Amino acid sequence: IHSCISGSAALPVDVQEKFEAVSGGRLVEGYGLTEASPVTHANFLWDVPRMKGSIGVPWPDTEVKVVSTETGEPVPIKEIGEIVIKGPQIMKGYWNRPEDTKEVLHDGWLYTGDLGYMDDQGYFYVVDRKKDMIIAGGYNIYPREIEEVLYEHPDVVEAIAAGIPDPYRGETVKAYIVLKEGSSVTEEEMNQFSRKYLAAYKVPRLYEFRQELPKTAVGKILRRMLVEEEKQKIKDDSQKHA
């Protein structure tokens, strides 16, 4: 194996490093959307310095900027905002869905719904989906940051973080984890591990170990399905006590 490109979902740095150690090849991350036919960014396949965790640089003839989610104005380098893209590969619109088209296309710019930033060398990073950002007790928390830490644990095979409804904090961070077969890691041990690398408000309040996580046909973990499960549990509990 010489080179591979990863897309569709965020590539944990730990997974990237393990893949390269086992295969001897180079694994780089790219980025794109169906609405962008579908690639807009990629890391270099040849041997040049790369930034781990980055989706790379824009493709030729592709314009990219990061804008404030509140004002729509461009934000400074390394500041998080929404990634918006313009180029020949951007769609003209959704077929027979004019209202949906208006939501994502403005003056030829595609508003991706992804939060990220650009560094001082022109490399871009995706932090998370705008809709997946967790707001707990007034803090903005990005699930991917938590997941990167969880994947560093030697017994973790898969992990995903989500914001579940909380009557006091708005949302609470919950981590869903698949452990290696035979692992005896406990919730408390995972909590202590997380506290070493995360600010206190980012540490998951809840952990759930599962045999597997719900996925799409191409293996992407379905965060929304897990959140819906939690909402259904709350609904069922409220009906029991009604």
Where are these regions (language model features)?
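Beta-strand->loop->alpha-helix junctions that form or flank phosphate-binding loops
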Residues: 28-35, 55-58, 162, 208
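Short Gly/Pro-enriched turn/cap motifs at secondary-structure boundaries
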Residues: 52-59, 74, 104-108
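Acidic/polar alpha-helix N-cap and adjacent early helical turns
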Residues: 228-242
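Gly/Ser/Thr-rich phosphate-binding loop
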Residues: 1-50, 63, 70
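AMP-binding/adenylate-forming core of the ANL superfamily
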Residues: 65, 77-91, 109, 115-116
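Active-site glycine-centered loops adjacent to acidic/histidine catalytic or metal-binding residues
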Residues: 8, 32, 56, 114, ...
